Design a protein with these regions (language model features):
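Short, small-residue-biased leader/transition segments that mark boundaries at the very start
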Residues: 1-6
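Alpha-helical scaffolding segments of alpha/beta enzyme cores, especially the outer helices
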Residues: 13-20, 24, 53
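Flexible, acidic glycine-rich loops studded with aromatic residues
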Residues: 28-45, 49-181
Length: 181
């Protein structure tokens, strides 16, 4: 136990040094939610990738939080189980799942610490920009609507109509989006 505490203290101190270093130049430090478990400066942003429980814990410690749950916003996961899908890292996050994301249960004061939603695309299997676009679109539309709209309950059928129009607009700059199912 003693050595574990020493490692946690050193990790926290190192994190604080980095946060102070970037803050002096006017930037904010952002750490993955594992680092948010350390008792660190409340100005350090926590990127909550492991889910709403970790996001809520970071908020309750006073950290600003960016929601990036791997269960909904990891766009390097498959969009469909169809065998025609390009190779992905694993997992399955279809469009409906992105659209259906529920924010963590927080008080209004706690919710003010949530600074936004973010999708991540890790590119180990995505060897060109066309594949990155394919994995992002149309899921990025669902994420954007979830982030910027307060309609509840959300109407997936209505969203799909809006998404179809948006995908038409993306054809002009030749974005390689996945078609709607």
């Amino acid at each position: 136990v003693g050595s574990e505490m020493c490692i946690r203290d050193r990790s926290r101190d190192f994190l604080q040094q980095i946060a102070d270093y970037v803050r002096k130049d006017g930037y904010d430090a952002i750490v993955w939610d594992e680092a948010g478990e350390l008792e660190a400066d409340k100005h350090i942003f926590v990127m909550a990738w492991r889910g709403n429980d970790f996001a809520a814990a970071a908020v309750r410690k006073g950290h600003p939080v960016i929601l990036a749950p791997c269960s909904h916003f990891y766009f390097d996961y498959y969009q469909s189980s169809a065998p025609t899908e390009p190779k992905a890292i694993g997992g399955l996050i279809p469009l409906r799942q992105v659209y259906g994301y529920e924010l963590p249960e927080l008080s209004p004061e706690e919710a003010s610490k949530v600074r936004g939603l973010q999708a991540n695309i890790w590119t180990e299997y995505l060897y060109d920009m066309g594949l990155v676009e394919y994995m992002a679109w149309p899921r990025a539309l669902a994420l954007a609507e979830r982030a910027w709209s307060d309609c509840d309950p959300r109407d997936y059928k209505s969203f799909r109509s809006r998404a179809a129009l948006a995908l038409k607009l993306l054809e002009h700059p030749a974005v390689n989006s996945r078609p709607l199912d």
